[in-house]
Amino acid sequence: FVRDNKSRPGMLYVGGNDGMLHGFTASKGEEKLAYVPRGVVPKLPLLTAPAYNAGHQYFVDGSPMTGDVDMNGGMQDPKAGGYDDYVPDWRTLLVGTLGLGGKGYFVLDVTDPTATTAPSGSAPAFTEANAASLVKLDRTRGSTATEPVPNCAAMTVAAEKTACLEAIEEDKDIGHITAKPVLDENNAMRSTQITRLNNNRWAVVMGNGYNSTNERPVLLIQYLDNTKELKKIVATGAQTVSTDPKVDNTNVLANGLSAPKVV
C-alpha cells in the first residue's frame, strides 16, 4: 500500500466556517473535496442571516487527522493458521470533528484524491456519485438541546430500532471535541490516535470532549474497520458505561476528556 501510493499528491484538509471540510492539493491549491457534515446542516441558513455579524457561528471548527487503516483488520488472528491467505484492504482515512461548531466526529475515505473512476473493491474516487463510499461514518450533530433526535419508535424492524436507541444513548457521552490531534513525536504528519489495538483491530481513540449530555469524561474507542462499533470507557470515579451519571457523579458532572496519548 505504501509503495503503491508513494507518488500520491500531497493534500491539505481544513475545516471552514462555510460549513464544509475542504481538501486541496498541496502543490496547486486545487480543491478536490468539499464535505458538509450532517451536524452542521440545520444551521447552514444562518450563514446568510442579515444579523450574522452580530452573532458569529462556528461550523467545521475541529482539526482533522488522517491515518492508514486495514479495513479488514481483526477478521483473522495473525497467529491463526491460514493467515498467509489473508487479503488486507488498506485505506487512508480522515477523522474530523466539529469543534465548537457541534458535537461528534466523522470519518472519510481519502485514499485516492486523483482517481476519476473506482473499480469494484478499490478506493472511491472523489465524486458526488461516490459520496456513500467516501463517507465511512458521520456521528455529528448540532450543539443545541432542541435538535431533533431520530424517531426510533417509528422503525418497524426490531434490530434497526434497537440500534437506533443504542446510538442515541451513546451520543449522550459525545460532546464538543476541540482538542488538536496528538502527533507522533518522530513524524508530525502522523496522528497516534489512529492506531491498531492489541486485538488486531483499527480504531481512532479520542476524548469525548466537553458539554456532552451526560457531562462526564469518557474515552471513546471508535473502531474504523468491519462493523465500526463504538466502545466507551468512563474515565473517572466508579462509573461504568451503564451507570446513571446523575446518580454517581463523583468528579464527573460538568466534565469532559481531552485528546489522549496512545502508548
Predicted regions and their residues:
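A fold-level detector for beta-propeller and closely related beta-sheet-rich head/sensor domains
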Residues: 1-263
